Amino acid sequence: MSNQNDGWGETATETSAPAPPPASAPVSSSNNDGWGEPAPSAPADNGWADAGASNGGSGANNNDGWFDAPVPPSSQPPKKEASDIQLQDDTEGLITNTFQVEVKLADLQGDPNSPLYSVQSFKELNLHEDLMKGIIAAGFQKPSKIQEKALPLLLSNPPRNLIGQSQSGTGKTAAFTLNMLSRVDPTIPTPQAICIAPSRELARQIQEVIDQIGQFTQVGTFLAIPGSWSRNSRIDKQILIGTPGTLVDMLMRGSRILDPRMIRVLVLDEADELIAQQGLGEQTFRIKQLLPPNVQNVLFSATFNDDVQEFADRFAPEANKIFLRKEDITVDAIRQLYLECDSEDQKYEALSALYDCLVIGQSIVFCKRKVTADHIAERLISEGHAVASLHGDKLSQERDAILDGFRNGETKVLITTNVIARGIDIPAVNMVVNYDVPDLGPGGNGPDIETYIHRIGRTGRFGRKGCSVIFTHDYRSKSDVERIMNTLGKPMKKIDARSTTDIEQLEKALKLAMKGPA
């Protein structure tokens, strides 16, 4: 079979596993067609009980040696709890398996065999045959690491909550997609699963993945974003994907739009953003309050800071947890460096000089402000360069068209804000430029390291090679870069924008890194 894998699963040759399948196959509904399952019994609490402490990780730093730069000092990693189980992965494939995940069971007194079992083929999950057809058609041959660990936990019965943290581009979307497709009953024409995303761009992408994997099923999807639905029309699709505000509006309108009592699964993609961001967080919690207490809550993100983790534990009580070791949050395949400039003007001149590198594949340039994104795009276009700008002030239809054009390769360089910093998957992106260092906003002190991780995660996805360049121009931005290096324990090569030799070396290094082996 010609492999059309888009990176959601590994492409290594499938291997058989000697262990029996876990007790995780979905239970058939009364229709006995292999779809859906009986509604789980309601928990004793109201969904807001305190959960266990958040999980940490430890391990050695792995420097790829691309640049001869000293490794900055890093803080001592947190002490691992006795209840953490370290899982190794020996498979090979598209995704470079250099990181480790830790699985924390919600109930350590239960049978450890099923939750700890890691499948090595999709067949071991006892999925419906129509889902297996979709997996094959999508080019999957073998689960990625996060899928291997998460799917047995997600599909086990009775359903359990799950909090999953794994680096960008490792297949989280396909994992929760298979769970939703397995939990809903296609013979019932009403929403039974909801997936919340922080942006319309990410919501549209998630719908595409669900439609691709579920193409041989009778499961329908509905995109719940501003302007996508008539306020008086009833939703007859089984899976809703959308942004918080629109979903709250739908749920508040009651049974004439959809029946909240039928919802079985609630998924938060980029959960830390949904929980922490003012406005989005309130709407996300409102959605939870409008749903039955026995809904399976599934939270996924590439990052979870301690504060967000505390809220996640309350949002998804007694959840199974899958975490990356903290020092493995960034991807080794991404070559990180920073360009030292003297002024804002020199930053633009350096970006313009690097245009030939930006179009080797595709590139995303992240700015702090919308006006900056537009200004840079206008200047580059006036100089004859083909670029586009994208941010939240543009009309919805225009945003969709711009991102579709970039995804299809019509545009090589996209100048944008954080609107696509999270979750967006465009495999051809092999370079990310942080034109402005992400900061914590008004009242914040220092760089927003989580946003930095998400930004550079737009490249180097699914084990592909990629480069990240961050621009500095004053004391604060240089200090912020030092803090990023110290926190991540990842060295960056300094390039002097004033040096013609350095710029030439940078161009050669970038071209070599993006064309040669990672």
Swiss-Prot record:
Predominant localisation class: cytoplasm
Enzyme class of the recorded protein, top EC level: hydrolase
Biased composition regions of type Low complexity, renumbered to the chain: 44-53
Region (Disordered): 1-85
EC number: 3.6.4.13
Annotated CDD domains: DEADc_DDX19_DDX25, SF2_C_DEAD
Classification via InterPro entries: DEAD/DEAH_box_helicase_dom, Helicase_ATP-bd, Helicase_C-like, P-loop_NTPase, RNA-helicase_DEAD-box_CS, RNA_helicase_DEAD_Q_motif
Domain Helicase ATP-binding: 153-322
One Pfam family cited in the UniProt record for this chain: Helicase_C
Annotated protein name in UniProt: ATP-dependent RNA helicase DBP5
Record organism: Cryptococcus neoformans var. neoformans serotype D (strain JEC21 / ATCC MYA-565) (Filobasidiella neoformans)
